[in-house]
Swiss-Prot record:
Entry comment describing in which tissues the protein is expressed: Expressed, at low levels, in seedlings, roots, stems, leaves, flowers and siliques. However, at protein level, not observed in older leaves, flowers and siliques.
Biased composition (Low complexity): 87-98, 505-527, 584-594
One of the GO biological process terms: lipid metabolic process
Function: Protein tyrosine phosphatase that also exhibits a weak lipid phosphatase activity towards PtdIns(3)P.
Protein name: Phosphatidylinositol 3,4,5-trisphosphate 3-phosphatase and protein-tyrosine-phosphatase PTEN2B
Gene: PTEN2B
UniProt GO molecular function: phosphatidylinositol phosphate phosphatase activity; phosphatidylinositol-3,4,5-trisphosphate 3-phosphatase activity; protein tyrosine phosphatase activity
Entries under PROSITE patterns matching the protein: C2_TENSIN, PPASE_TENSIN, TYR_PHOSPHATASE_1, TYR_PHOSPHATASE_2
Species of origin: Arabidopsis thaliana
Disulfide links within the chain: none
Amino acid sequence: METDPANSSSKSPAVVSEKDVLIPEPSENTVGVVQDPVSAEREAHEDSISTEASVAKVDDTQMPASSTGSEPLSKTDDIVPCPPGSSPRESPPSIFSSSGLSSWAKSFKFQQQDPNRTDSGMSAFTRFTSELGLHLPTKGSEEVGDSRSSNTQVGGAFESLTKAVVDSSRGAVKAMQVKARHIVSQNKRRYQEGEFDLDMTYITENIIAMGFPAGDISSGLFGFFEGLYRNHMEEVIKFFETHHKDKYKVYNLCSERLYDASRFEGKVASFPFDDHNCPPIQLIPSFCQSAYTWLKEDIQNVVVVHCKAGMARTGLMICCLLLYLKFFPTAEEAIDYYNQKRCLDGKALVLPSQIRYVKYYERVQNQFDGKVPPERRCMLRGFRLINCPYWIRPAITISNHTDILFSTKKHQKTKDLGPEDFWIKAPKKGVVVFAIPGEAGLTELAGDFKIHFQDSDGDFYCWLNTTLTDNRTMLKGSDFDGFDKRKLPAPGFHVEIVMIEPDNSQPTKSKSDSTQQQSQSSSSADSSKLKSNEKDDDVFSDSDGEEEGNSQSYSTNEKTASSMHTTSKPHQINEPPKRDDPSANRSVTSSSSSGHYNPIPNNSLAVSDIKAIAADASVFSFGDEEEDYESD
């Protein structure tokens, strides 16, 4: 009897092999990648149904053959799949069960939608992925990203461009500074080692000469901007802190520029005097003693001397220090050594007055045991210009370190006269003299004094010291500061400076009284002869038309001189009145028939009066009228 297939299938359970059982294992891909909340929920439901069916099949295979399918299928919800080889009770609940999916879904915490958020227009999937930390590109985000990236690129390009411009500007400024500093330093030797390039020279291992350390606001606004082309303060400090830390002391010689001494930790000493000038003679031994005291404290100590350029004033004081320390026996050797060390061409200390003061200090060392002798007081009598061409007729100013002692522009008798009027031709050819008639001298001097000749072709001047200078001093043109800068030549030009003691009206005469009287009696004849000679010599005449234009004045001068020398009772002015004499206020006296002096008021002197008085050789007599002057 044939059985019905339908009945047989309902009566006998279906046999399911292990191959037919599909037990999916959880993986990272299964957990992490979720496409959409709706689709994810649908897939979870389908997986749950398939899992229940699979469990049911497994359960049927494990049931005995005699069992029937009378138990309801709803009990399969409590069955949890487990891996093969393990008991169902020991395995944890699977995430693919309903309870596992519920707990897995609860682990996600979604924030509430903020209506004010800018991403409210985003899709649900985009918001979901953003909550999971998966920033997937969208059209809006691409636009925002493009704008941000473009802004970033523009900002980066601008920043790079700005940095390049700043770097190039700094490089250009640095190059300009280096160029300017080399131009300003000119022929001076520079210290160029390692990272340093400074206007600085080691004269010895312990004596350094350098330019002014500028660039600090404490030295004033001009000193601050000088840092662009001079040694910069920061670089100088860095150099000494690197090479001579706690072993250096700075000596500032500038009177026109100071700075905060604390920048050098207070190790700064100031010995100021003006540029292109000489110091008070007492300042030199004080400087040398201070430097020596610092050097002997430690063998590694160094002294750093500077003025503005670090050449002339610095050279004067360093050369004197070399003499003080017995490096050299003579001033010439010390000056030559310093010049070779400081400058490439050996022209550092070149001003004649400053060289003269180094020689003064040599005399102080050798003759006065290093101590400056007391100041000698004397009277400046006048000047004589020898081999003087007509184009040299300077105004005169006498001064010291604090005051102006005499000036032809301010003196009562000369302030209204031009230089060509108060410089008087002497009987000797090419000689002009200057003195104040009727006065003991131009001014009283003591110690250092400066003679400044102000001429249209260029000023020239010199510094002297009464204690270390003779009463009669002859200086060549090359002995004056600034004379070499004049355009017009003056070969053989000399200046004789005549000083007298305060208690004497005239210096000691080199000729006898009889010779002097003979010279005075022949002054009118010499004056007449000089007149005829000067007509043929344009070099020593004031102008081409002077002789003709002033012939009447010369005639008056000769007559006045003759009358002053041929009276029956001559009252020649061999000596000007002393200052303590009541007649000191008289400018000049003349002869009269009664033999008495008639004073001429000071304010009555005119150009013709000065020239008339100048014809009398005794007024401008320095005691050597017979002396001849030869051109060098």
